[in-house]
Amino acid sequence: MPVEAGFVQRLFGTALDDLLPGMRLHVRRLGDTRRALSLGGGRIYLPRSFFEHADPHRPLRLAHPVVAGVFAHELLHQWQRLQGRAVTYEAFGLHLRAACLRRDPYQYQACADPHQMLQCFLDASVEQQGQIWQDHVQALVQGQPLACMCLIAEHVHQAQVGQTKPGQTSKD
């Protein structure tokens, strides 16, 4: 996983270093196999098409903006867990409410000001944070970085393991 490890370190600095040796990428075979899924312990399930030649023994196609963005989204869920967020529990509730109320759990309000965008990120749900990060990484891979994301990138890259908002605990 050398290609993927370099990608992780560029985006997250040392924040995921403890997780990298045990991180495993799998082809998603259950549920909606077109979608990615992140579980605790560095387990990430991705569509077969995300791997070079659709072979899960080959590297991810990280030059493709969508592949890089979705992988980054799932990596952010790993990062959130290390920050103390109960990602699986929170995401389950978000998706359940989305199904019942027809709300997009990924939708967020983008803004041009980096400070406001950072506050949006800090206040966001786990899926909104994942989508914000995905949009940031897709723009980077396309060679069109979004200036409004610079403080978010700095925050994620410099975060230390175990930093949580007051009152948050990890449940998964």
Regions found by a protein language model. Name each.
Residues 1-44, 48:
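Auxiliary, metal-adjacent structural segments of Zn-dependent hydrolase domains
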Residues 3, 66, 70, 129-132:
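Extracytoplasmic/secreted proteins, especially bacterial periplasmic and envelope-associated proteins
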Residues 8, 71-73, 77, 130:
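Generic structural signal for small/hydrophobic residues in well-ordered secondary structure
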Residues 12-13, 80, 84, 135-139:
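Sec-exported extracytoplasmic/periplasmic mature domains
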Residues 35-36, 48-72, 118-122:
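Short pre-active-site segment immediately N-terminal to the catalytic Zn-binding motif
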Residues 41, 89-172:
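Metalloprotease/metallohydrolase-associated module, dominated by Zn2+-dependent proteases
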Residues 74-93:
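Catalytic Zn2+-binding segment of zinc metalloproteases
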